Amino acid sequence: MTEKKYIVALDQGTTSSRAVVMDHDANIVSVSQREFEQIYPKPGWVEHDPMEIWASQSSTLVEVLAKADISSDQIAAIGITNQRETAIVWERETGKPIYNAIVWQCRRTADICEQLKRDGLEDYIRDNTGLVVDPYFSGTKVKWILDHVEGSRERAKRGELLFGTVDTWLIWKMTQGRVHVTDYTNASRTMLFNIHDLDWDDKMLDVLDIPRAMLPQVRKSSEVYGQTNIGGKGGTRIPIAGIAGDQQAALFGQLCVKEGMAKNTYGTGCFMLMNTGEKAVKSENGLLITIACGPSGEVNYALEGAVFMAGASIQWLRDEMKLISDAFDSEYFATKVKDTNGVYVVPAFTGLGAPYWDPYARGAIFGLTRGVNSNHIIRATLESIAYQTRDVLEAMQADSGIRLHALRVDGGAVANNFLMQFQSDILGTRVERPEVREVTALGAAYLAGLAVGYWQNLDELQEKAVIEREFRPGIETTERNYRYSGWKKAVKRAMAWEEHDK
């Protein structure tokens, strides 16, 4: 029998699909990536073609094995991680989508959400699903599809249509329609799932008029769901054995599996998650309660805060303001000045996320004086990412009663040493940057590997979690608090800007 040397992680993201092969030491052996089209039918609407998601993801799987000259019988298992909340509805019989995937960023269901608020459902939704009423989550997207595609609700009631988030869609396709499942982490992002009963919530299904017959079975994040023979020479069937939504996969990939451990992912936005163990901590501070993975993929809970503009604000400096020609230049220019000269940039281009949740806030620059130059604005924009992270962390510590001792970080912007040092300074806590930056794929690989015995337990994985660099606070508490109070003042003035116009 051929030795099972490798694990494959499929990382289906918002703009691209990736496949990553890892060996037993969690080293990356091979990577393949394909971008796909973003569809914008109207302002604020975002769609993907589900068939293109599938084509891009399946081709990266074939490609990544061919590239490394690996046959499918050398693969122990496949793990899947995915963009969360994005909703797909397809025909059970043909596997054909009845509409494009409605992407997590899409705001078309704002009216449905406003109606839910008018109907007094906010508290019920928060208490039972852990989420706020927002177009972000899948439930209102599914309702929209059933409302707008003729005859679809009746077909769904007859069991002819299926719903899934991206993980469910991929597994359905990989198993030729034999397996219709999701995991607890993805289910917890739909606004249809009761995170305490660990089952679909009948009241939410009733309110949104979504037939239970179309919903997938919900399973643990680490177990064998089915097998696929796609991707390899020799047609060996490979177990699909791990699923987690991208942020929960990153939390697991950073091995934040104990209560009080937290990670922040610095991508287009920031996503901070803190594991709260077996208890769902109620948030009084505008955070989401979501399901995360415990040490063997079982249900744990987490607090989650999303910042909308992190890397996106650096792109703004590059693309719209033309202050830098490359995102990497931001560190160089930020360190050419000793501080921001009193400037604060609030990058509320699309409103503010956690803990403010103000869709009417708008971007602003405060504290401008004659001596301010472009380097001060670049530095202040970078600092805004760290301030927003502190906003979320303060809310987490208040809700959980846990004082964070170290923050694990990942994502594109963590390569910026200035930002990471300032993050440590403004939090007053250690910031740990791992050697392997592909933590989302790593999380999916770990979940799959643990399910099939490729790795025995987490102790075996702890040795592989090497911290490449640790940043420690370098400023005094008084200085830290003074700077942060300036940020709070700036945010307050940027809030509710749009409402004044109306």
Curated annotation (Swiss-Prot):
Cellular component terms per the entry's GO annotation: cytosol
Entry EC no(s): 2.7.1.30
Domain of life: Bacteria
Residues at which glycerol binds: 84-85, 136, 246-247
PROSITE patterns: FGGY_KINASES_1 (PS00933), FGGY_KINASES_2 (PS00445)
Keyword Glycosyltransferase among UniProt keywords: no
GO molecular function (one): glycerol kinase activity
Reaction catalysed by this enzyme: glycerol + ATP = sn-glycerol 3-phosphate + ADP + H(+)
Binding site for sn-glycerol 3-phosphate: 14, 84-85, 136, 246
Residues bound to ATP: 14-16, 268, 311, 315, 412
Pfam families the UniProt entry points to: FGGY_C, FGGY_N
Record keywords: Allosteric enzyme, ATP-binding, Glycerol metabolism, Kinase, Metal-binding, Nucleotide-binding, Transferase, Zinc
Function recorded in the entry: Key enzyme in the regulation of glycerol uptake and metabolism. Catalyzes the phosphorylation of glycerol to yield sn-glycerol 3-phosphate.
Protein family: Belongs to the FGGY kinase family.
Name this protein carries in UniProt: Glycerol kinase
Taxonomic source organism: Salmonella typhimurium (strain LT2 / SGSC1412 / ATCC 700720)
